[in-house]
């Protein structure tokens, strides 16, 4: 570990320790003994003070640093100061936190490659980009929007905006195989899958990482998706109701038609039975008299009825007279005359 602390690191730790823009004024202000002063040397060594003096006079100064971890700190966009300057500006640019107006939010220190190494934070990167005029026009527009434009009231939505920018379609939470957020490549959905509120995408991701259930994630549903779903369900119910009404009407009409057909067949059958019955009624003498009518013959008339002809009366009269003939006898001539 380095046996001294640079004046740059002391300035980043607390700029109030310096009474002027010249960092070397620190020696006079704090009366640092000559033996504890570490002068600047060629080869990149910055001016500073011994670690023993700092340990004695600045008891709260963090002498022990965390080891640099790429997987832990790299994702937070920390960049080695010297490497960043060499890549974007020049390797000959002096490290001057006073000129850059740096503080502890712009530069942090880690123990890396056997020494105390300064790393730029995102704020430090932006300040250097502005200072050396490294920003493009589009970047300036974005910064202006978030600092003075319409996006200023929505600075807390950065994580959601970041997710929205990289999406290829509306964010969807699917439950197959456990809840997960699908941001691209959705080809099939189930009935219980839903669209996420765009302003809460980051919260959904964190909830899924915490292991929340698919049902509990429904509080993050998109309001428009909910409204469209409700409208769709209402439409489906209305269509189903109309279908039921039409089906019942169709059933009633079909039933009526069936009953009418049955009635027609029954009537036709009755007519056939009646016709068949009439065909079996007998007639008398070929005169067409119907069976069962009274027989109006002379035998049923009264003797001497004036309505009958006289010959008929004579016939009946003759029948009443005793026969003058005897068996095998002949009439006498006198009787014949």
UniProtKB/Swiss-Prot annotation:
Amino acid composition bias (Polar residues), ranges on this chain: 297-315
Region Disordered, residue ranges: 285-337
Top-level taxonomic group:
Viruses
Keyword Coiled coil listed? The answer is yes
Q: Which UniProt keywords apply?
A: Coiled coil
Q: Composition bias, kind Basic and acidic residues: at what positions?
A: 287-296
Q: Which residues form a coiled coil?
A: 248-276
Could you tell me what this protein is called?
Answer: Uncharacterized protein 028R
Organism equals Invertebrate iridescent virus 3 (IIV-3)
């Amino acid at each position: 570990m380095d046996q001294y602390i640079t004046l740059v690191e002391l300035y980043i730790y607390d700029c109030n320790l310096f009474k002027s823009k010249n960092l070397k004024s620190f020696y006079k202000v704090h009366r640092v003994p000559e033996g504890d002063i570490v002068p600047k040397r060629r080869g990149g060594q910055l001016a500073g003070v011994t670690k023993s003096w700092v340990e004695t006079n600045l008891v709260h100064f963090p002498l022990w640093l965390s080891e640099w971890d790429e997987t832990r700190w790299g994702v937070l966009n920390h960049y080695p100061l010297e490497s960043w300057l060499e890549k974007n500006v020049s390797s000959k640019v002096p490290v001057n936190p006073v000129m850059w107006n740096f503080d502890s939010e712009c530069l942090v220190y880690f123990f890396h490659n056997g020494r105390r190494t300064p790393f730029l934070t995102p704020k430090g990167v932006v300040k250097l980009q502005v200072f050396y005029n490294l920003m493009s026009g589009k970047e300036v527009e974005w910064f202006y929007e978030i600092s003075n434009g319409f996006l200023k009231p929505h600075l807390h939505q950065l994580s959601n905006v970041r997710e929205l920018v990289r999406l290829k379609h509306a964010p969807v939470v699917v439950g197959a195989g456990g809840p997960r957020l699908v941001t691209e490549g959705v080809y099939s959905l189930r009935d219980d899958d839903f669209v996420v509120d765009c302003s809460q995408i980051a919260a959904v991701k964190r909830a899924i990482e915490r292991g929340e259930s698919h049902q509990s994630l429904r509080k993050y549903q998109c309001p428009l998706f909910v409204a469209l779903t409700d409208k769709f369900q209402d439409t489906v119910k209305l269509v189903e109701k109309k279908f039921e009404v039409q089906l019942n009407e169709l059933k009633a009409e079909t039933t009526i038609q069936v009953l009418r057909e049955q009635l027609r067949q029954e009537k036709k059958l009755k007519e056939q039975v009646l016709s068949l019955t009439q065909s079996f009624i007998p007639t008398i003498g070929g005169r067409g008299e119907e069976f069962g009518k009274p027989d109006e013959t002379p035998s049923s008339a009264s003797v001497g009825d004036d309505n009958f002809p006289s010959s008929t009366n004579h016939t009946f009269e003759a029948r009443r007279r005793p026969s003058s003939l005897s068996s095998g006898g002949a009439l006498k001539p006198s009787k014949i005359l």
